[in-house]
Amino acid sequence: MAASARGLRTLQSAHSSTTVPRLQLAVSRCYATTTSPDPPITNSSNSSNSTPTPKQRITAFKDKLNAGPSFSDFVSGGGGGASNDRVPLDPAEAYALKTALVGPPGRKKQIIRLPSWLKTPIPDTPNYRRIKSDLRGLNLHTVCEEARCPNISDCWGGSSKSAATATIMLMGDTCTRGCRFCSVKTSRTPPPLDPHEPENTAEALSRWGLGYVVMTSVDRDDLADGGARHVAETVRKVKQKAPGILLECLTGDYAGDLEMVALVATSGLDVFAHNVETVEALTPFVRDRRATFQQSLRVLKAAKEARPELITKTSIMLGLGETETQLWETLRALRTVDVDVVTFGQYMRPTKRHMAVHEYVRPGVFDLWKERALEMGFLYCASGPLVRSSYKAGEAFIENVLKKRRGEGADGGDGGNSTRREDVERLVAGGVVR
């Protein structure tokens, strides 16, 4: 083996000692690839006397485009015919143009482009950065970020301190349930509760100086009480630090434990919110299997029975494939448990792992369902493509209702037990409601 190795090294050194002249090799390659003789050398004086080739005007291409067919010629299907032969697109055909084919070759699929009424600006304002800094400093979470809410630029980027708001998410950023529409992280064993969260939440809300605040929470089926005592303690801490603040809590169903529902409802909050999310027929396909439509109705009913003067609220997503008949049945079911406020919003797919959007509902349809809800006796209805259950679109109205009730109680009135019709009539007379 040693002798063969020495022989191999000797052979390698012999090859390396043979050098190939680089210039000669380059010249040989040049001759090998040249098929025509060298161009003649021209005198510089002759080239200077030659007439330069005229350059085409830069605008020549633009002139040709302007003289050609316009964009309307393409979308209207018109070619070279007369203009009176071109038929404008109807709404269905125009809407069909908002589709696109995406994906690799052979596996392309058609998607619907996001309608213009669902596009929002990128958040970047001083108030947005201030709220984000406060949340990070106090180790707090918001549903605005975790659920990828499209209204974050509006809610966090208010022009003034009182105009900006955020929805605090209690009990961490990890949920024990996996609804197909929600982008919040899920785990069977989420981190333990932060014992300082109630105090930190109260500190943040008192620092912002807001008049109306929404708190929500993840579902914690790993806890015996579902986190109800933690939520109730947070409400009490907030009311101690900011007694004048109006507080709305968007809660889970606490696995159907109505005692825990009553505990939260009587903790001092002003609005009890729990979302049914969709119609009953679609609930098994949209929500986690542990959440049912009838259980949500029982939660809303129990909260109202625990405090009859408490405003109860729920939210419904459109665009999941629900029918008009199913929506009517849902509203009737909500009225049977005396729900005061309902909101309608467009479902928007957060990631490819979540269920697809069945339909982008037009703004006019949202306006129609708002009228129908008010006719059925709901105290208020916020309805629109970008409306969310904790969006501030309906908070101004509810805030005025609560302030009216507080004022009546202080003046020796009915102590906050005014009826739904009286509240609405007073606010209409005052110009608050249109």
Swiss-Prot record:
Domain Radical SAM core, residue spans: 158-379
SMART domains: Elp3
Pfam family, one: Radical_SAM
Binding site for [4Fe-4S] cluster 1: 144, 149, 155, 390
Xref: InterPro entries: Aldolase_TIM, Elp3/MiaA/NifB-like_rSAM, LIAS_N, Lipoyl_synth, rSAM
Reactions catalysed: [[Fe-S] cluster scaffold protein carrying a second [4Fe-4S](2+) cluster] + N(6)-octanoyl-L-lysyl-[protein] + 2 oxidized [2Fe-2S]-[ferredoxin] + 2 S-adenosyl-L-methionine + 4 H(+) = [[Fe-S] cluster scaffold protein] + N(6)-[(R)-dihydrolipoyl]-L-lysyl-[protein] + 4 Fe(3+) + 2 hydrogen sulfide + 2 5'-deoxyadenosine + 2 L-methionine + 2 reduced [2Fe-2S]-[ferredoxin]
This enzyme's EC code(s): 2.8.1.8
Transit peptide: 1-31
One Gene Ontology molecular-function label: lipoate synthase activity
Binding site for [4Fe-4S] cluster 2: 175, 179, 182
Pathway: Protein modification; protein lipoylation via endogenous pathway; protein N(6)-(lipoyl)lysine from octanoyl-[acyl-carrier-protein]: step 2/2
Region feature Disordered, mapped onto this chain: 34-55
GO cellular component labels: mitochondrion
Compartments reported by the entry: Mitochondrion
Entry keywords, A to Z: 4Fe-4S, Iron, Iron-sulfur, Metal-binding, Mitochondrion, S-adenosyl-L-methionine, Transferase, Transit peptide
Cofactors, names only: [4Fe-4S] cluster
Comp. bias regions, Low complexity: 34-54
CC cofactor note: Binds 2 [4Fe-4S] clusters per subunit. One cluster is coordinated with 3 cysteines and an exchangeable S-adenosyl-L-methionine.
Top-level taxon in the UniProt lineage: Eukaryota
Primary location group: mitochondrion
Family classification: Belongs to the radical SAM superfamily. Lipoyl synthase family.
NCBIfam families for this protein: lipA, PRK05481.1, PRK12928.1
Protein name: Lipoyl synthase, mitochondrial
Species per Swiss-Prot/TrEMBL record: Paracoccidioides brasiliensis (strain Pb03)
Lineage: Eukaryota, Fungi, Dikarya, Ascomycota, Pezizomycotina
